[in-house]
Curated annotation (Swiss-Prot):
It comes from Enterobacteria phage GA (Bacteriophage GA). It holds the Pfam family Phage_MS2_lysis. Its main location: host cell. Keywords: Cytolysis, Host cell inner membrane, Host cell lysis by virus, Host cell membrane, Host cell outer membrane, Host membrane, Membrane, Transmembrane, Transmembrane helix, Viral release from host cell. Disulfide bonds: none annotated. Induces the formation of specific membrane adhesion sites between the inner and outer membranes, apparently leading to host cell lysis. Lysis may be performed via activation of host murein hydrolases. It is found in: Host cell inner membrane; Host cell outer membrane. Belongs to the Leviviricetes lysis protein family. One of its GO terms (cellular component) is membrane. This is Lysis protein.
Amino acid sequence: MGLKAKHKENLCSDSERSKRLYVWIALAIVLSDFTSIFSHWIWGLLILYLQTLMDLPTFVMNV
């Protein structure tokens, strides 16, 4: 009897583990989507920043 109960416990923990794994995979997918969106924003901001840096000497010369 005790052995059967233990086996059931193991099955339960396995299903919980797989559920946790699916949650982590879903989180990873969502986070990767967010990071790709943010990376687009970051690249855009970097390009704008670089453009302003390139325009900075002319701006300083004008002042």
